Curated annotation (Swiss-Prot):
GO MF term (any one): structural molecule activity
Name this polypeptide is given: Envelope glycoprotein gp150
Keyword NAD: no
Gene: env
Binding partners and assembly: The mature envelope protein (Env) consists of a trimer of SU-TM heterodimers attached by noncovalent interactions or by a labile interchain disulfide bond.
A cellular-component GO term for this protein: membrane
Matching Pfam families: Env-gp36
Post-translational modification: Specific enzymatic cleavages in vivo yield mature proteins. Envelope glycoproteins are synthesized as an inactive precursor that is N-glycosylated and processed likely by host cell furin or by a furin-like protease in the Golgi to yield the mature SU and TM proteins. The cleavage site between SU and TM requires the minimal sequence [KR]-X-[KR]-R.
Transmembrane segments: 786-806
Keyword Cell inner membrane set for record: no
GO biological process: symbiont entry into host cell; virion attachment to host cell
Length: 856
């Protein structure tokens, strides 16, 4: 500065004025200053010296104040004044912008790196020496303040999002009970099984429809093998027979007597039989039992009440068995005949004892053989009789009938039959609860329809080698002089004609009662007059037991009957109960597990829709488990209609009610209350399995059974992978026990409703109290959703304010500076040399064009 100005200390020239104005503008360049700090008039482009002089005169007081302000500040390295503050602000802004430009540039490089090519040059740029500023110099700027707020807000936002994700995940896991569960489990000991029969257009079975028998299973949930239908063959058989002959036993009794039949050595070894014989009306037999005699009625046994059948051979689940051919009387040939000759090997009391009291031979090593034999019979008219055209009394339809004089008992329907192969029968002890003389065989024979005869089936008995001595029992074998035995040849030779007859009666033992059916007048209705023939039509799955015969050499003191041949066919004492049991052994009685299987598809629904879907499946399973399979509405058909389910709990109730109306289920008041309870207390109610899982295995509502993957069946006793209890450290038995406790609580509410009031007022009040106590649990997701939404909205607003406002302010400020052409000028460095004040003032004075006199 000029020496004259320093000495005077009052006048400031254009050169000094320009620096002072720069200082003023620089001091205003901070975050607290105005958006437009102003311009330096001495730096306006095109300004003249005259104009600068005028500015000096006009701004002299302001310039004097600025000079005094500068003189008050010590310009040292440790205190750079407001110029140092300005440089800090400028450098901080440039640092932020540099980071932004670096991020944008690197992002652009990642997007277009393929277009840039593989050649890259790394350039080392020396980092400039930066000034260091302490916290006191930095102070609390707007950038620092908003940066801290941004950090806190962002951390809070991520924390809230993490909490929300955890809540959603935990809620989803609670609804997934078991992703790979057993489809069925064995029934337990205390359970009652309801069963029914099903045969299309069969009067005996239709009459039986609706009747139920209570059966108990002796098994535990931990057992891998549960009871089979064969365990209840006796009950099933007795019920079927009694049901089929119910009207017969109510009809007119022809004859009744009691008799005791003893063996050759008295009643030793339980060889006595107490017989009470009832002869019912033959008309009943024609209507109800005729076709059953030939074993041609296909009957399926069905389980109700939520029980199912697992076929251990085909690995299939079903509600009913395959069609079964169940004959009501003894047959030489029958399905899976199981008679054993050696009494010592028989453990099951239901298996008939085929031993004989006076034989040395015994049969063992029996093998089942299918029937590969045919019997052909023909009849030639031999008895007198008349042909008339009449309407049958037992069937409304015109047909030919032969009406001889039955009262004279002179009529005997005789036939000649032959076999297609040699059949050697084993020894016997007795016939159909009575003695049949000679060698014998019984079989069914089918007559085709012709011009004079309609189609019919007959029961034919062939006998040969009948002895004359009635005191001796005709016995298969060749050994002579056996006490009480008449040896006969029991081989039926192929293509040899034997004299046979239509069976005119039979006896049937039901429990301890032996019933005799007189078929004399029933045979009349077959239209047997004239010449006709028939052919045996044994089912392909029927057969006989072919056994080896061995002579017992342990006791030679008494002469006994020896083996007639090396092999023999077991024929006597075919037990229909044993045959039925063996047909039913492959069906294991199982039940549906006590939980709800949620398919993976449902788990992908939105939370509200997912809860509604589970509600619907729970309600359907609850009602269907009470209704059972006998109503015609299977769980498969009902659940599959609603697996794309519904929105709210109320809508779920309406849809379930509609489904029940469609399937004609009687929805009484109590059942409706159970349905509503099932929806409201699913948190404490047992989870029910539905046939929804079957659909996942490829079933639909039109299928009555479906395949079960073997690996699922084998793993039904496995340890649960993940449950809502104990993170999977629980066995199936423990799972079942826990669900049983919940089930008891659920049924406790139902029993309270049933015992206190038909309308269930008290039970519903308790249920409403329970709902009031725990109702807020169901609203937690809704509350969390609203709270989370509000927090997220506020957080995003704060975040946008923190991030955008400072950047926007700086952007506007920089843009205005660029437009106005303003550039920040840093304070010039002060030299350490001492400046002569007089010379500096004089220089400045001459620059302003003043003389020394004017200066004085």
């Amino acid at each position: 500065m000029a020496e004259g100005f320093v000495a005077n200390g009052q006048w400031i020239g254009p050169e000094e004025a320009e620096e002072l104005v720069d200082f003023e503008i620089a001091t205003q360049m901070n975050e607290e200053g105005p958006l437009n700090p102003g311009i330096n008039p001495f730096r306006v482009p095109g300004i003249t010296k005259q104009e600068k002089q005028e500015y000096c005169s006009t701004m002299q007081p302001k310039l004097q104040a600025l000079r005094n302000e500068i003189q008050e500040v010590k310009l040292e390295e440790g205190n750079a004044g407001k110029f140092r503050r300005a440089r800090f602000l400028r450098y901080s802004d440039e640092t932020i912008l540099s980071l932004i430009y670096l991020f944008i540039g690197y992002f652009r490089y990642l997007v277009d790196r393929k277009r840039f090519g593989s050649l890259r040059h790394d350039i080392d740029i020396e980092a400039p020496q930066e000034e260091c500023y302490n916290n006191k110099e930095k102070g609390m700027t707007e950038n620092i303040k908003y940066g801290k707020r941004c950090l806190v807000g962002t951390a809070a936002l991520y924390l809230i999002l993490a909490i929300g994700i955890i809540i959603i995940i935990r809620t989803t896991d609670a609804q997934v009970v078991w992703r790979l569960p057993p489809l069925v489990v064995p029934v337990e000991e205390s359970e009652i099984i309801f069963w029914d029969c099903w045969a299309p257009e069969e009067p005996a079975c239709q009459d039986f429809l609706g009747a139920m028998i209570h059966l108990k299973a002796s098994t535990n949930i931990s057992n891998t093998e549960g009871p089979t239908l064969g365990n209840w063959a006796r009950e099933i058989w007795a019920t079927l027979f009694k049901k089929a002959t119910r009207q017969c036993r109510r009809g007119r009794i022809w004859k009744r007597w009691n008799e005791t039949i003893t063996g050759p050595i008295g009643c030793a070894n339980n060889t006595c039989y107490n017989i009470s014989v009832i002869v019912p009306d033959y008309q009943c037999y024609i209507d109800r039992v005729d076709t059953w005699l030939q074993g041609k009625v296909n009957i399926s046994l069905c389980l109700t009440g939520g029980k199912m059948l697992y076929n251990k051979e085909t690995k299939q689940l079903s509600y009913c068995t395959d069609p079964l051919q169940i004959p009501l009387i003894n047959y030489t040939f029958g399905p899976n005949q199981t008679c054993m000759w050696n009494i010592s090997q028989i453990q099951d009391p239901e298996i008939p004892k085929c031993g004989w009291w006076n034989q040395q031979a015994y049969y063992n090593n029996c093998k089942w053989e299918r029937t590969d034999v045919k019997f052909q019979c023909q009849r030639t008219q031999s008895q007198p009789g008349s042909w008339i055209r009449a309407i049958s009394s037992w069937k409304q339809g015109n047909r030919w009938e032969w009406r001889p004089d039955f009262e004279s008992e002179r009529v005997k329907v005789s036939l000649q039959c032959n076999s297609t192969r040699n059949l050697t029968f084993a020894m016997r002890s007795s016939g159909d609860y009575g003695e049949i003389t000679g060698a014998w065989i019984e079989f069914g024979c089918h007559r085709n329809k012709s011009i004079r005869h309609n189609a019919a089936r007959f029961r034919i008995r062939c006998r040969w080698n009948e002895g004359d001595n009635n005191s001796l029992i005709d016995t298969c074998g060749e050994t002579q002089n056996v006490s009480g035995a008449n040896p006969v040849d029991c081989t039926m030779y192929a293509n040899k004609m034997y004299n046979c007859s239509l069976q005119d009666g039979f006896t049937m033992k039901v429990d301890d009662l032996i019933m005799h059916f007189n078929m004399t007048k029933a045979v009349e209705m077959y239209n047997i007059a004239g010449n006709w023939s028939c052919m045996s039509d044994l089912p392909t799955e029927w057969g006989y037991m072919n056994c080896n015969c061995t002579n017992d050499t342990s006791n030679n003191n008494t002469r006994k009957m020896k083996c007639p041949k090396e092999n023999g066919i077991l024929r006597n004492w075919y037990n229909p109960v044993a045959g039925l049991r063996q047909s039913l052994e492959k069906y294991q009685v199982v039940k549906q597990p006590d939980y709800l299987l949620v398919p993976e598809e449902v788990m992908e629904y939105k939370p509200r829709r997912k809860r509604a879907a589970i509600h619907v499946m729970l309600a359907l399973a609850t009602v269907l488990s009470m209704a059972g399979a006998g109503t015609g509405a299977t769980a498969i058909g009902m659940v599959t209609q609603y697996h794309q389910v519904l929105a709210t709990q109320q809508e779920a109730i309406e849809k379930v009610t509609e489904a029940l109306k469609i399937t004609n289920l009687r929805l009484v008041t109590l059942e409706h209350q159970v349905l509503v309870i099932g929806l409201k207390v699913e948190a404490m109610e047992k989870f029910l399995y539905t046939a929804f899982a079957m659909q996942e295995l490829g079933c639909n509502q039109n299928q009555f059974f479906c395949k079960v993957p073997p690996e699922l069946w084998r793993r039904y006793n496995m340890t649960i992978n993940q449950t809502i209890w104990n993170h999977g450290n629980i066995t199936l038995g423990e799972w079942y026990n826990q669900t049983k406790d919940l089930q008891k609580k659920f049924y406790g509410i139902i029993m309270d409703i049933e015992q206190n009031n038909v309308q269930g007022k008290k039970g519903l009040q308790q249920l409403q109290k329970w709902e009031d106590w725990v109702g807020w649990i169901g609203n937690i997701p809704q509350y969390l959703k609203g709270l989370l939404g509000s927090i997220v909205g506020i957080g995003l607003g704060i975040l946008l304010l923190i991030l955008c406002l400072p950047t926007l302010v700086d952007c506007i400020r920089n843009c205005i500076h660029k437009i106005l052409g303003y550039t920040v000028i840093a304070m010039p460095e002060v030299d350490g040399e001492e400046i002569q004040p007089q010379m500096e003032l004089r220089r400045n004075g001459r620059q302003c064009g003043m003389s020394e006199k004017e200066e004085e």
